[in-house]
Amino acid sequence: MSWVLIGVAGAAGAVARLLVGAWIDGRPGGRAFPWGTFAVNIAGSLLLGLLTGLVVGRGWLAPEVKVVLGAGFLGAFTTFSTWLLDLHEALRRGDHRAAFVNAALSTGLGLLAAWLGLALGWGR
């Protein structure tokens, strides 16, 4: 497998995250809640579940495709570190409610999205 392909996919994922995040966070309401980070993480969880189901469950894609798209594109598209930074920032400014809602929604919906993606990918 080519490390270059993983790197190119990672670069594309990072650019996609930046564009999606900027588009969502630039809408009315701004950064009262980190919707851009939330959206890419939930979408990425769904897509990685789907990709895994298609590779492992159905064998429709080669395992190498899962590595390039999963570790490369989706690994760069989603962002655990930015999510934690958003939580820290909410706590720093004393907005414990926003931090709790962000943590609960991101974790709960992220797990649900991954499960849904797996179910769709496996065909169940």
Curated annotation (Swiss-Prot):
<dbReference type="GO" id="GO:0140114">
    <property type="term" value="P:cellular detoxification of fluoride"/>
</dbReference>
<keyword id="KW-0407">Ion channel</keyword>
<dbReference type="Pfam" id="PF02537">
    <property type="entry name" value="CRCB"/>
</dbReference>
<dbReference type="GO" id="GO:0046872">
    <property type="term" value="F:metal ion binding"/>
</dbReference>
<keyword id="KW-0812">Transmembrane</keyword>
<keyword id="KW-0813">Transport</keyword>
<keyword id="KW-0479">Metal-binding</keyword>
<dbReference type="GO" id="GO:0005886">
    <property type="term" value="C:plasma membrane"/>
</dbReference>
<feature type="binding site">
    <location>
        <position position="78"/>
    </location>
    <ligand>
        <name>Na(+)</name>
    </ligand>
</feature>
<dbReference type="InterPro" id="IPR003691">
    <property type="entry name" value="FluC"/>
</dbReference>
<keyword id="KW-1003">Cell membrane</keyword>
<feature type="transmembrane region" description="Helical">
    <location>
        <begin position="4"/>
        <end position="24"/>
    </location>
</feature>
<keyword id="KW-0472">Membrane</keyword>
<protein>
    <recommendedName>
        <fullName>Fluoride-specific ion channel FluC 1</fullName>
    </recommendedName>
</protein>
<keyword id="KW-1133">Transmembrane helix</keyword>
<comment type="similarity">
    <text>Belongs to the fluoride channel Fluc/FEX (TC 1.A.43) family.</text>
</comment>
<keyword id="KW-0406">Ion transport</keyword>
<dbReference type="GO" id="GO:0062054">
    <property type="term" value="F:fluoride channel activity"/>
</dbReference>
<feature type="transmembrane region" description="Helical">
    <location>
        <begin position="67"/>
        <end position="87"/>
    </location>
</feature>
<comment type="function">
    <text>Fluoride-specific ion channel. Important for reducing fluoride concentration in the cell, thus reducing its toxicity.</text>
</comment>
<feature type="transmembrane region" description="Helical">
    <location>
        <begin position="36"/>
        <end position="56"/>
    </location>
</feature>
<feature type="transmembrane region" description="Helical">
    <location>
        <begin position="103"/>
        <end position="123"/>
    </location>
</feature>
<keyword id="KW-0915">Sodium</keyword>
<feature type="binding site">
    <location>
        <position position="75"/>
    </location>
    <ligand>
        <name>Na(+)</name>
    </ligand>
</feature>
